[in-house]
Amino acid sequence: MKTGSLTQRGALLLLLLLAPAVTPTWYAGSGYSPDESYNEVYAEEVPDTRALDYRVPRWCYTLNIQDGEATCYSPRGGNYHSSLGTRCELSCDRGFRLIGRKSVQCLPSRRWSGTAYCRQMRCHTLPFITSGTYTCTNGMLLDSRCDYSCSSGYHLEGDRSRICMEDGRWSGGEPVCVDIDPPKIRCPHSREKIAEPEKLTARVYWDPPLVKDSADGTITRVTLRGPEPGSHFPEGEHVIRYTAYDRAYNRASCKFIVKVQVRRCPILKPPQHGYLTCSSAGDNYGAICEYHCDGGYERQGTPSRVCQSSRQWSGSPPVCTPMKINVNVNSAAGLLDQFYEKQRLLIVSAPDPSNRYYKMQISMLQQSTCGLDLRHVTIIELVGQPPQEVGRIREQQLSAGIIEELRQFQRLTRSYFNMVLIDKQGIDRERYMEPVTPEEIFTFIDDYLLSNQELARRAEQRDVCE
C-alpha cells in the first residue's frame, strides 16, 4: 500500500508540473482562434462539466453584426452579452436582409449555435422601355425611386415612378411610351395668279409641304385634297389641303388658298342693227370681240376690239349703217366686189315684167323681207329685153353694160324665167327654173350656207320675223 500511494503522488506532481507548459489555443470567452472573424456553427461538443463556468463574462466572443444588431439575454443579467447560455436575437438594419439564424446561443463549446449576416436588399434591374428611359435615385437598392421619361414626341402611359420595396419587388407596373403627337406639317403660302390671256384659268405650281414626325421621324403617308401642282385652276378661290400620317396613325393637316383672278373689261354692247361675237368669256383679258351688222347694213369702223390687261377695250366701237351700193361702176366685177363676204345675192331674171313666174316670185319675196335681211340676202332683178331691159338693186338702176355682164357671168338667159343664188364668196350655189317659196330658199341657206356665227345668231333671232 505504501508503494501505491507513492506512485499516485508522483503522477499528480508530474501533471501539475507539465500543465503550465501547454500553450492555450483560444482566447478567454471567445472560443475562436485570432484569425476567425465571422459567425460559424459547430457541432455541439460535450464539455468537461468541471470546466463550465457561468460566471465568466466572455464565454463566447462578442457578437458584432455588420449592418445589423444582436439583442442578447444572459442568465447573469442584461450587462452580459456573451456569457455561457446567453441567447441573442439577430436583426438587420433597414435595407438589409438577414441570412442565417435569427437566434443564436452561447454554447458550452464557447461557440455560438449558428451564424448569420446582413445582405443588402436589391431589386432586379429594370428593363429599358421602348422610346424611353429611366433614372434612379439609388440604383436598384431599397427605397430607390426610378422615374421614367419618354423620348421627344412620345407620351408616357402608366406609372411614372417605381420604388424598390422591402420584398425585392418594384412597385407599380412597367409603363410604355406611346406616340400620340401628330406630325408637324407646314403648307406653302397661299398664292394669287392672274389668268392667262384669252383664258379663264391659270396654271399654278407650288412646292410640297414640309412634313416632320415629332417621334421617330417616320411619315407613312401624305395625301392631297385638291388639284395637283401644275393644274389649271378656274377663276375663284380654291382650298388645297394636305394631310400627313405617322407610323402610329396620328395625323396632321394644313391648307392654303389658290386664288385665280380674271381681269375683265366692261361688257360691250352690240351695235344697233348688228351683233357681237367674242372669244373666250367675251370680257376677259385677251378676249377678242368682232362686230357684225345685220343684213342690209355694213360696218363703219374697226372690225374687232381686244380686252387689254388694263381692263380696257382697244379701239372704239364701230357702227352699222345702211349698206350703200354704188351702181356707178365700170364693170359687173366692181359691182359684185361690194358684196364680197358681206351679202348673198339672189339674181332674178325674166323675159318681161308680165311674166307669170316673175310676178309670183317677186310677190313672195317682197313679203319675206325680214327673213332675207336676217340671212344677208340682196335681190338683183334683170327683167325685159334690150333696149327696154331693166336692171335694179332696190331702187337703184343698173346700166345696160352691167346688166349684160351679169347675164354672161352668171349664165342667165332672157328667154325664160330663171334665178341663181350666190354665196358671200361669189360662188353660184343654187339655180331655180321656176318660182320657189321663201321657206325653201331659207332652208337651203340655213342648211348649207350659214357660218357658225350666223347659226348662233339665227338661234338668237329665231322668232324675230314672226
Curated annotation (Swiss-Prot):
GO terms for molecular function: hepatocyte growth factor binding; identical protein binding; signaling receptor binding. Residues 70-120, 121-179, 263-322 form the Sushi domain. It is found in: Secreted; Cytoplasm; Cell surface; Synapse. It comes from the Eukaryota. Keywords: Angiogenesis, Cell adhesion, Cytoplasm, Disulfide bond, Glycoprotein, Proteoglycan, Repeat, Secreted, Signal, Sushi, Synapse. PROSITE patterns: HYR, SUSHI. The keyword Signal applies. InterPro entries: DUF4174, HYR_dom, SRPX-like, Sushi/SCR/CCP_sf, Sushi_SCR_CCP_dom. Contains chondroitin sulfate chains. Disulfide bonds join C72-C106, C92-C118, C123-C164, C150-C177, C265-C307, C293-C320. Forms homooligomers. Interacts with PLAUR (via the UPAR/Ly6 domains), ADAMTS4 and CTSB. Interacts with HGF; the interaction increases the mitogenic activity of HGF. Acts as a ligand for the urokinase plasminogen activator surface receptor. Plays a role in angiogenesis by inducing endothelial cell migration and the formation of vascular network (cords). Involved in cellular migration and adhesion. Increases the phosphorylation levels of FAK. Interacts with and increases the mitogenic activity of HGF. Promotes synapse formation. This is Sushi repeat-containing protein SRPX2.
